[in-house]
Amino acid sequence: MTAFPPSRQSPDVPPDGLPAPGRFAHLDPGDGACLMESAALLAGGDFTDSPAGTHPALAALARVVNDSVGDATRHALWPLAAEFADARPLDRAYTSLLVGSVVDAARVLRPASWRLARHGRACRRRSEKLTHTPAGGLPGRAADLLWWRGPGRRYLEHALRVLCAAPDADQRLARLLRRAVAEARDRTAGDGVARGGRVPAGEGREGRCNR
């Protein structure tokens, strides 16, 4: 059984000197910080909403959740901020697995949606194809990046629009993000990646999902 790395605990409220949780991106910590910007500060990095230790697809999910939920839920999610520093799995199937889990959550609300069903099948096919595929190699990384910036992101955005329209959207989105972070950290630990390790080439800052 894979040993899980010790979790860095965030306080329930931001410590003195750290910005209060807020929606959207910020130019300066004095104006507040979204969940990803808080994660970057806690990791000791630059003030950015795309911290190096967080997988781009997970960061995109976190930005949408942060910007879509109410203030109370956003503050309740603050303890997750430190977890994002070690949430960048290297296995190539991870992106499609994450997007597929969001699509599945949306299908609970719209089980008859042919579009969501098609997106879910596409994610499953890609995940099955890439499971146990080595992470190395520029061609593979380029193909993964193209999928994420193309259909992967479109599938994620559509599923999140469905979830955001639910009457209990805050609860659904918060639960989804908590599970996604836990899964990403578990997979990162399984990769044997050193905490705060180097970001693989070609996987730098991603475009934003919702901005």
Where are these regions (language model features)?
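N-terminal, leucine/charged-rich tether regions that mediate assembly and partner docking
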Residues: T2-W78
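Structured binding/interaction patches within domain cores
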Residues: F47-G204, R208-R211
